[in-house]
Amino acid sequence: LVIYAELLFLYLQLQFPYTESQYKKIKVAFLIHNWILLILCFTSGSYMDSRFWLKSATSGADPNYLSGWFVIPLCFAVELLFSEKIKKVWKILITAQVVLSFYFIMQTASKSGLITNACVLAIATIYTFRSMIKEHPGRALTVLVIFALGVFIAVNNMPAYLVQRLSNGDTTGTGRFPMWVTLAETMLNNPIKMIFGFGTSAVKYYTGTGLVSHNTYLDLLFNEGLVGFIPLVIYIAKSIRIKIKKCPYTVIAFLGMSVLLLTLSAFNTRFFMLLLFLIGMDVTEDLE
């Protein structure tokens, strides 16, 4: 019932259209939120097991979840960074925001978090380059050189533990793949429950470890069944088809987030719900 309640609440939120100017304010709000998050990282961060954590009473402070909060702001940051309507002083601040965000993302030593945010940044930049190369080839070349230099510096200054995790695999011992196999076999052996679901939060009782599966899509399919999984997939597919031209950066953020969701149980997280809202919201032209 949880998924239906959340989807109903999401549906009610999406009954109100938003103008382009209001949508722009939402983007700015995400950038402001990101600066607040960066301030919290500086003031309330700590290291445990060679990974950066944010001191908090919620699970959102977990390194993997923390990296997820940077996805949406990074995508909007790239969009505004290359906009000709934005003043240079704001572009400098946005550049600093992107650099600091990746610094803390790397400090979390989250493989999926780093890959997700790097993909979002790269795809958003490449998408922007399509028009920039035609209109301002010199500027595009300069940005490309700066981007390549930034990647080189970042790669050569990665935390040692992150390099170890990237090269040697996950050393946390969660054993994601065996859990996925166990859950898949359980569903195949119980076709009725596969259709209607095993029940909210049931997944951790079937993994054999007492842990969630660390896969949002698998969690959803197992807990809520096909009757809960299919409506969400339809909602996402229809929203992306509509938004791909009108709000491309939101779609890029969602596609990038999908990488993180493959290794993280994040259906009930605020950043995922916000992203579902962003890809579903109706954006209309401003009235003259």
For each predicted feature, which ranges?
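Aromatic-anchored segments of alpha-helical transmembrane domains
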Residues: W35-L40, V99-Y103, A148-I153, L255-S265
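Alpha-helical transmembrane segments of multi-pass inner-membrane proteins
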Residues: L7, Q22-D49, A61-T128, I234
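Membrane-anchoring hydrophobic segments
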Residues: L1-L40, N168-G169, M281-E288
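Membrane-interface micro-motifs in multi-pass membrane enzymes
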Residues: L1, A57-P73, S213-T216, L221-G225, ...
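Structural signal for the C-terminal ends of transmembrane alpha-helices
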Residues: Y11-S21, A77-K85, A122-M132, A154-N157, ...
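A membrane-periplasm/extracellular boundary helix in multi-pass inner-membrane enzymes
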Residues: T108, T125-N168, A184-N189
